[in-house]
Amino acid sequence: MNLLPLTFLFPLVGFLLLSFSRGRWSENLSALVGVGSVGLSALSAAWAIFSFHSSPPEGGAYSLVLWQWMAAGDFSTNFTLYLDGLSVTMLGVVTGVGFLIHLFASWYMRGETGYSRFFAYTNLFIASMLFLVLGDNLLFLYFGWEGVGLCSYLLIGFYYSNRNNGNAALKAFIVTRVGDVFMAFGLFILFQQFGTLNIQELLVLAPQKFPEGNLWLTLATLALLGGAVGKSAQLPLQTWLADAMAGPTPVSALIHAATMVTAGVYLIARCHGLFTLAPDILELVGIVGAVTLVLAGFAALVQTDIKRILAYSTMSQIGYMFLALGVGAWDAAIFHLMTHAFFKALLFLASGAVIVACHHEQNIFKMGGLWKKLPLAYASFVVGGAALAALPFLTAGFYSKDEILWEAFASGHRELLIAGLVGAFLTSIYTFRLIFVAFHGEPKTEAHAGHGISHWLPLSVLIVLSTFVGALITPPLAGVLPESVGHAGGEAKHSLELASGAIAIAGILLAALLFLGQRRFVSALAKSAPGRFFGTWWYHAWGFDWLYDKLFVKPYLLLCQLLGRDPIDRTLGVVPFSVRGGHNLLSLTENGRLRWYAASLVGGAAILLGALLLA
């Protein structure tokens, strides 16, 4: 376990080396340092995970105090690494999937300006995420939380010479900062009430000090939920995720599969004891997830950009995880987080291969017939798409998503179950719409398959992990998270499995019917009045950007314009202006004429006499 600090030190050192190189290194050397540091981190993580399983720590968790960061009076905080079943799972996902993404990126980014800068940012991204999942208290978790936010800004705006990319990065940074402010308020409340931010101490003290439904716990968990929805792109702070596709495609894979958007799910799962004492907020978590997954599913139906379709699918799948957390299916949420990392990384990397092969074309309707020219990318999309659609029995996504649906049913949340089933149907349609349009039909562009081990190896490994093989990896969460209500299952569970499987297959068949062939019905529907209305509404993600522009952006710009004129200074300037005006008026009386002075003297005396008589 002494190797545990190396998991984040290796990518941190890689970041420093690449930063100080200032782009002077060759691409091969930059790739060696950038990919190698994450590879060493993955090896260190593998050893830590092996040691955790072979020699289970007493109490189910291992703590390693590195140093005391701060001490003031009764307050002290240590930088301590905490490894239990939950952090072991996250450690494997972040380093394992992160390494595969880095390996693919070494091929994808060849010839790009800022090659070493890219790997410097991604190394820092991995280090920040590991800092987040290994910290034993919410303060250090928050440092990692802000670190991944900074890295997302740097990577989304990687092509900063393009104004739109810079705007997308700024949008992601600002929207997620809103959630971060809420999270900071949550930390303030928890520290004020408990005098500590150590997560394990909070989980012990909370039920001792407060009853279920306590106002302070409700406010604290609501604030933590605000932070979670910002990082994990859930309603109402979901608007940044689709625009984040402005960054390089491996960045999208890193954000969606291995790092940033899973942070909110991890936060709620890690603080499960606090949320169970605030049942109203826990129920709100499930509702937020259910609404998000349905709205994102409809938005994905009409997108034409290959990466934006996958972005909305991520929003929807994170919604399933929030739904699971909301019904108390803690294990199922983390299980789906893991399997989702496999097939979403596969889909994004495969989309990167398609984009490069098609000369950076991202509109799926300008592709077509790619299955012959790009067999590996096609296989990746078929397997990854099947896992995303939860094709029964063959894919990892089926087992994790089905567990969520069963827990929603077993806990009595039928409305959330219905939302999950609707989302499953939509997922099947938009996923295979992408596959049928891009890979079948008449070719519309020249495409050339990529070569090299850094291209095909990550895709091949992720293809295997996206099948039922990935579902065989069981997160060691026993004793870490509360046991779910519907843990056992039975005949009802098998019936639900068949129903959800049938829904997934029905969605695939409907997509084939609509998008294989001439697509006359789809064209006619798109040209109809309802089709134009809903198509435009869904294409713009239900108009949230428009709404926020009217509610927040325009008033803010108006306020900036008003303050730019410095109204306070102008208001305060009235005083000296009045004094100067009075002085100018009085100076007119000094005209050097004796008659005027005598008249003024008599007039002043008359005024004083009148005032005395009235008094």
UniProtKB/Swiss-Prot annotation:
Record-level GO cellular component terms: plasma membrane; respiratory chain complex I
InterPro entries: NADHpl_OxRdtase_5_subgr (IPR018393), ND/Mrp_TM (IPR001750), NU5C-like (IPR003945), Proton_antipo_N (IPR001516)
Pfam families referenced in this protein's UniProt entry, alphabetically: Proton_antipo_M, Proton_antipo_N
Protein EC: 7.1.1.-
Residues passing through the membrane, by range: 1-21, 32-52, 63-83, 85-105, 138-160, 172-192, 210-230, 249-269, 281-301, 318-338, 339-359, 374-394, 417-437, 461-481, 496-516, 594-614
Primary location recorded for the protein, binned into one broad class: membrane
Catalytic activity from the UniProt record: a quinone + NADH + 5 H(+)(in) = a quinol + NAD(+) + 4 H(+)(out)
Subcellular location: Cell inner membrane
Biological process terms in GO annotation: ATP synthesis coupled electron transport; electron transport coupled proton transport
Membrane topology recorded in Swiss-Prot or TrEMBL: Multi-pass membrane protein
Alphabetically ordered keywords of this record: Cell inner membrane, Cell membrane, Membrane, NAD, Quinone, Translocase, Transmembrane, Transmembrane helix, Ubiquinone
Example of a GO MF term: quinone binding
Gene3D superfamilies to which the protein is assigned, alphabetical: 1.20.5.2700
Domain of life: Bacteria
Protein family: Belongs to the complex I subunit 5 family.
Subunit structure: Composed of 13 different subunits. Subunits NuoA, H, J, K, L, M, N constitute the membrane sector of the complex.
Free-text function comment from the UniProt entry: NDH-1 shuttles electrons from NADH, via FMN and iron-sulfur (Fe-S) centers, to quinones in the respiratory chain. The immediate electron acceptor for the enzyme in this species is believed to be ubiquinone. Couples the redox reaction to proton translocation (for every two electrons transferred, four hydrogen ions are translocated across the cytoplasmic membrane), and thus conserves the redox energy in a proton gradient.
The protein's name: NADH-quinone oxidoreductase subunit L
